């Protein structure tokens, strides 16, 4: 079992737990190296760092940046960043503004599908008013009885081809990697097994990521199967990329894995945490 977890979310994006509570949970689960990586948001880092330092947990400042690559939405995790760097702060500010606009359009789409009041409902679940996400809509729809859990809401209403799906232009891959680099961090392709990419597009993505100076692939993560650990480990080796590991924890009952419950990386991979 790894004592490292480099992907998690708090109430400052779409997680359920406050940064301080999340950090304490990491400690209680035996994590010794922990990163908070809220979606497009840095405001929870100071609180999480303070608790980690008080408990003897090494803290890594992180973020998960939303990216549009071709027709796919990707997530790029930045680790060991300087949260005060003006470049990444300004870039994330633009993304958050876009999130607000997207939330309004999602609500309009759901209203057309006969589900009213979803924007106000989602906002009630969002502790950060600048970051109303699909997860907040999903929690409200579960409350209203439209599905048993948030995963079912996504499949029924919020993914491509469903009533509440809204296309959106996020940051480019180059922008995300550049912001992370300028902030002194390392960039990681998050949960690559989740993306619907053909083999050709997968190769193109990895090559482009390397050309831009990308550092690592998240090989071990909550949504990956054991087979995917091996598959993405091989890709990391082939492209000379390091390997990261993170639960992608959002909260109890909403995550594939709890914090601190990650298996070891496949043999022969270079851990990204060797970089900081």
Spans of features found by a protein language model:
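An N-terminally biased module of ancient metal coordination in phosphate/nucleic-acid-related enzymes
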Residues: 1-72, 157-160, 171-179, 183-184, ...
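Extended substrate/RNA-proximal surfaces in nucleic-acid metabolism proteins
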Residues: 51-210, 263, 267-269
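C-terminal regions of proteins
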Residues: 257-258
């Amino acid at each position: 079992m790894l004592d490292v977890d480099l992907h998690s979310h708090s109430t400052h994006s779409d997680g359920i737990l406050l940064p301080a509570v999340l950090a304490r949970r990491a400690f209680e689960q035996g994590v010794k190296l922990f990163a908070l990586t809220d979606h497009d948001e840095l405001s929870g880092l100071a609180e999480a760092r303070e608790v980690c330092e008080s408990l003897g947990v090494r803290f890594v400042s992180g973020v998960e940046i939303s990216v549009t690559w071709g027709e796919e939405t990707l997530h790029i995790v930045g680790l060991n960043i300087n949260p005060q760097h003006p470049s990444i702060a300004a870039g994330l500010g633009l993304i958050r503004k876009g999130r607000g606009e997207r939330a309004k359009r999602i609500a309009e789409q759901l209203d057309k599908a006969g589900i009213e009041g979803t924007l106000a409902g989602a906002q009630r679940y969002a502790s950060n008013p600048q970051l109303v996400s699909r997860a907040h809509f999903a929690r409200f729809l579960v409350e209203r009885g439209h599905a048993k859990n948030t995963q079912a809401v996504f499949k029924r209403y919020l993914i491509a081809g469903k009533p509440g799906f809204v296309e959106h232009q996020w940051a480019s891959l180059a922008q995300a990697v550049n912001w992370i680099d300028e902030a002194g961090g390392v960039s990681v392709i998050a949960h690559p097994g989740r993306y619907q990419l053909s083999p050709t597009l997968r190769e193109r993505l990895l090559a482009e990521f390397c050309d831009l100076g990308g550092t690592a692939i998240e090989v071990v993560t909550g949504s990956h199967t054991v087979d995917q650990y091996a598959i993405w480990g091989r890709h990391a080796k082939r492209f000379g990329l390091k390997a990261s590991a993170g639960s992608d924890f959002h909260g109890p009952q909403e995550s594939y894995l709890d914090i601190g419950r990650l298996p070891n990386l496949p043999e022969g991979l270079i851990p990204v945490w060797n970089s900081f």
